Design a protein with these regions (language model features):
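Intrinsic structural disorder
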Residues: 1, 7, 243-249, 293-296
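A basic, amphipathic helix-loop patch mediating RNA/tRNA/ribosome contacts
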Residues: 1-45, 206
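RNA pseudouridine synthases
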Residues: 26, 39-251
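Intrinsically disordered, Lys/Arg-rich low-complexity segments
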Residues: 255-313
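Bulky hydrophobic/aromatic packing residues
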Residues: 3, 63, 128-130, 187, ...
Length: 313
């Protein structure tokens, strides 16, 4: 982990404040002054600020935040727009959002102080449930795509105008339910296992339908329930237990995958070794056979020309 990031995740200082401390020469690693913001902190490194040791946090903290519409999921915005960190208490300014909700979307957003957990959760196939409202009636084509999945060579409809994402593959929805219908709109609850860039807006945009409202209400079993807009709460004990169980499963799966890869490499090396041994044995056998044939030929030649080997020049 980069030094400034390490400091922001394990102390009261923000990343910008960490940069200033490093620049001022107030940060040491193993008692040596460090002025490189990008220094990669290694396991066993002793990081200190003004002589005080910065201890790496081992305890996990998770919060649920009800993101309001009109806020960005980012630390800062060059255009001065409101971010979620303008709404969160300052003690959470170093927390990492797990996934994204776009500017016009609202609802459940998980944040953590653990980069490793954030990475695992963002890559997970955990269910994400949304309440959405589109400006069209639901069609048979939409339902078929929700059930079967969809690949679009051109998925720009519904995407941000500056997005560089062109094509997109949509996995089948885990679940969908129609919750309201009128001539001009349809309300749905849908569950996905992905969190791709403006995924639902692009999906329905393909069918010329605009998503008017989008609210995430659940992620991996963590529910928004009645948490007010713009407010946050810590995980409950049950939620912490569930996340620790999930992380344990991920670690076990990774360990099993690593073992299988090591076994595969070992088996491949063994096959290669046996192949080389077989080829070497074949070469030696061929060489021995050639030698035997030469000796036979030489003997036959000597019999046919008994005086040849005594020939004098």
């Amino acid at each position: 982990m980069r030094l400034n990031k390490f400091i922001s995740h394990n102390s009261k200082y923000s990343r910008r404040e960490a940069d200033k401390l490093i620049e001022a020469g107030e940060v040491t690693i193993n008692k040596v002054k460090i002025e490189n913001f990008g220094y990669e902190v290694k396991e066993g490194d002793l990081v200190s600020i003004r002589g005080l040791h910065v201890k790496e946090k081992t305890e996990l903290t998770m919060i649920v935040f009800n993101k309001p519409k009109g806020t960005l999921v980012t630390q800062k915005d060059d255009r001065g727009r409101t971010t979620i960190f303008h709404k969160l208490p300052g003690k959470f300014r170093h927390f990492i959002p797990i996934g994204r909700l776009d500017f016009a979307s609202e609802g459940l957003l998980l944040l953590t102080d653990s980069p490793k957990v954030a990475d695992v959760m963002m890559k997970s196939g955990l269910d994400r449930t949304y309440n959405i409202k589109i400006d069209k009636p639901l069609t048979a084509e939409m339902e078929e795509a929700m059930k079967e999945g969809l690949f679009l060579d051109d998925a720009r409809a519904g995407g941000h105008e500056k997005s560089k994402i062109y094509s997109m593959e949509f996995a089948p929805f885990v679940y969908y339910e129609v919750r309201g219908v009128s001539e001009n709109f349809t309300k749905l609850r849908v569950t996905l296992t992905e969190g791709k860039n403006r995924e639902l807006r692009r999906f329905f945009g393909h069918f010329d339908a605009n998503v008017l409202d989008l609210k995430r209400v659940e992620f991996g079993g963590i529910q928004l329930n009645n948490l007010p807009t713009g407010k946050n709460r810590y995980f409950t004990r049950r939620e912490y237990d569930d996340i620790h169980k999930y992380l344990k499963m991920v670690r076990q799966a990774e360990a099993q995958e690593q073992k299988e890869e090591e076994d595969r490499v070992r088996a491949e090396r063994l096959r290669e070794k046996k192949k080389n041994q077989t080829e070497d044995q074949a070469r030696r056998a061929e060489s021995a056979e050639k030698k035997r044939l030469r000796e036979i030929k030489q003997k036959n030649s000597n019999r046919n020309n008994p005086n040849k080997k005594n020939k004098k020049f």
